[in-house]
């Protein structure tokens, strides 16, 4: 049974997204940064192991992607999901398995060069896949598929996979309505949604990151309203079933 915390127009759940998502009402957009390489083995060099493990991982990706799509409004919605070149095969397999093709693949230029390995090129980019649902379309027809959002080695909130707020601002700005993040982490997507005046639903299964997300989103709510100088007091309960599935 998931713990639920309501902060203004944001509702946060501490639990497994595969259990929580079926209980949620419809949203307009899913914006998320799922774990890369889940349910795979490693060869000890930071690389995912052989093809069979990648394909097995696709079953888990397909499961949450299917639930995420089911949460979208039937007529119009989208999903932005972060990935990298190693997890690209897994995402592509999962997308094919659920018949939801990737609409666009955005290259995120980090404007920073990572440490990399001892033999290959040093990484300076990641990827963001855009999935369209219903009659969704990017309004700005001049928007290119390479975008620059600066990031460095410092993680302001401590999360090892933390994304810059500018990246999530971009995804929110080019998405409709209410936003769901089934892998909320430290709450960056939620902060971006709240700053844009959007309703937000987030799910996170790690207590540490959930608590940080609650704090960050509470601060964002306060900063976003001149009429409310104090952060909204969170309310919480242990019943996610109180939110009816649409």
Question: Where in this protein do the model-derived segments appear?
Answer:
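Conserved SAM/SAH-binding loop
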Residues: 15-19, 230-239
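Short, basic, helix/turn surface patches
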Residues: 129-137, 227-236
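Short, conserved SAM-binding/catalytic segment
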Residues: 5-7, 214-227
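Generic detector of low-complexity/intrinsically disordered segments
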Residues: 26, 67, 228-229, 241
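Core catalytic lobe of class I
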Residues: 3-203, 208-211, 246
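Intrinsically disordered, low-complexity and often Lys/Arg-enriched segments
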Residues: 1, 239-246
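Asp-based, Mg2+/Mn2+-dependent phosphohydrolase catalytic module
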Residues: 202-203, 222-227, 243-245
């Amino acid at each position: 049974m998931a713990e639920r915390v309501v902060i203004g127009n944001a509702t946060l759940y501490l639990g497994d997204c595969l259990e929580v998502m079926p209980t949620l009402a419809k949203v307009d957009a899913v914006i998320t940064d799922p774990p890369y390489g889940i349910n795979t083995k490693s060869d000890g060099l930071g690389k995912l192991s052989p093809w069979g493990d990648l394909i097995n991982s696709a079953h888990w990706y397909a499961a949450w992607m299917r639930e995420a799509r089911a949460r979208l409004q039937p007529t119009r919605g989208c999903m932005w999901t972060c990935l990298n070149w190693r997890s690209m095969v897994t995402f592509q397999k999962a997308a094919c398995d659920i018949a939801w093709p990737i609409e666009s693949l955005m290259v995120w230029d980090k404007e920073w060069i990572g440490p990399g390995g001892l033999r290959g090129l040093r990484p300076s980019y990641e990827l963001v896949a855009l999935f369209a649902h219903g009659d969704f379309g990017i309004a700005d027809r001049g928007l290119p598929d390479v975008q620059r959002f600066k990031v460095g080695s410092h993680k302001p909130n401590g999360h090892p996979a933390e994304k810059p707020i500018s990246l999530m601002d971009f995804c929110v700005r080019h998405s409709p309505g209410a936003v769901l993040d089934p892998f909320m982490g430290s709450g960056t997507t939620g902060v971006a949604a709240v700053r844009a005046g959007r309703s937000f639903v987030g799910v996170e299964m790690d207590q540490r990151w959930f608590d940080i997300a609650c704090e960050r989103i509470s601060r964002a709510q306060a900063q976003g309203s001149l009429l409310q100088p104090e952060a909204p007091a969170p309310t919480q309960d242990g019943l996610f079933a109180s939110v009816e599935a649409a």
